Every structure is written in structure tokens, then in C-alpha cells.
Amino acid sequence: MLITLEGIDGSGKSTAHAALRERLTAEETTFTREPTDSWYGSAVERSIGDADADPLAELFLYTADHADHLSRVVRPALEAGEPVVSDRYSDSRYAYQGATLEGVIDEPMAYVKRVHEPFTRPPDATLYFDVPPTVGAERAGATNKFEAADYLESVRENYERLIEAEPERFHRIDATQSESAVVEAAVETVETLLSR
């Protein structure tokens, strides 16, 4: 089973991912994230810090990192029968790069999805950490181009479109709650999913 954690910056998904890693010890589970720690992921991280990075080039950096992640980590773990829990995955690309490419290409989120469809492995379930963009930006510190509240509003709208298209896959977590409440909701949801 592939479970992904999604939400705008500052929503608490990385904190929940760390807590899940600590608390889910009953069975072998692969915990991973995107961007990865590969050289592809390093290129993505450099791009995040570059306010002038070309948005289309940036999309393909993220896509290369995702392809490597699939072949190196996700598919081998799933083939070995291990559940995978990923902090960010393809939906982040659809939501974030869909917002970044707005005004650059027509129907950007649909374009990004079409780029991924031939090779990606869709998640079985996704925890969506829902928080208002102003709260997310404040929590994240708005230290890069992807953490500004107005940009995060566009990203959140894209996430809502994804949820509307696949409501059965998404499990919404109210990330305006305390950190401990968010973590508990995430742990409970993942434990339920893994027990199916």
C-alpha cells in the first residue's frame, strides 16, 4: 500500500511523517519523501531557492526526481510487500507546479498530470493536511517562493480540485489543530489504512 502525505507548506505533514516513522513499528514500512536525497532531489532543492528558476524546467527537475524515487525506493518496497509512506508525492507536483505554470501554459495542472501518467504509481490513499494559506505561510516562515500566502492559496485550490476528483482516496486532516492532535489524527488514519 502506498500512502502519501500532502498539503501546503506549513501544514504539519513533515512533522506527522516523522511521528509516523517513530510510532509505526509493528511491521516493515518504508518511509520516504520528495524531493528525495538523491542528486535529482538536490537539483530540486537548488531550484526551490532560486526565485528566477524557469517554471517548466523546474517541473522536469521534480519529475526526474519522482521517476528516480519510483524506481529506486517506491516500487521495490511495494514489490517486497512493504507499505510505503511518503512525505509529498505526485499530488504535490500537480498542485504546486500547476500553480507555478499558471499563465505559462494552458491548463497547467492537467498538463503536469499528463506528464506523470505514463510512469507514476498512483497512491492508494492520501492524507491531506488542510490549513489556511495564511497559517501555512506563517508556520513555514515564507522563506522561499513556494511559501508565500497568495501562491499557497493557488496551491490549495489545486489540492481541492484533486480531492474533488478522487474523494475516496483523500483523508482530510484539520491541520489547524494542535500539533499533537494533528499527529494523533495522522497516526490513527494510517493505522486504520494499514489494517485493511
UniProtKB/Swiss-Prot annotation:
It holds the Pfam family Thymidylate_kin. Its EC number is 2.7.4.9. It is an enzyme of class 2 (transferase). Keywords: ATP-binding, Kinase, Nucleotide biosynthesis, Nucleotide-binding, Transferase. GO terms for cellular component: cytoplasm. GO terms for biological process: dTDP biosynthetic process; dTTP biosynthetic process; dUDP biosynthetic process. InterPro entries: P-loop_NTPase, Thymidylate_kin-like_dom, Thymidylate_kinase. GO terms for molecular function: ATP binding; dTMP kinase activity. ATP binds at G7, I8, D9, G10, S11, G12, K13, S14. It comes from the Archaea. The keyword Nucleotide-binding applies. It catalyses: dTMP + ATP = dTDP + ADP. HAMAP family: Thymidylate_kinase (MF_00165). Belongs to the thymidylate kinase family. This is Probable thymidylate kinase. It comes from Natronomonas pharaonis (strain ATCC 35678 / DSM 2160 / CIP 103997 / JCM 8858 / NBRC 14720 / NCIMB 2260 / Gabara) (Halobacterium pharaonis).
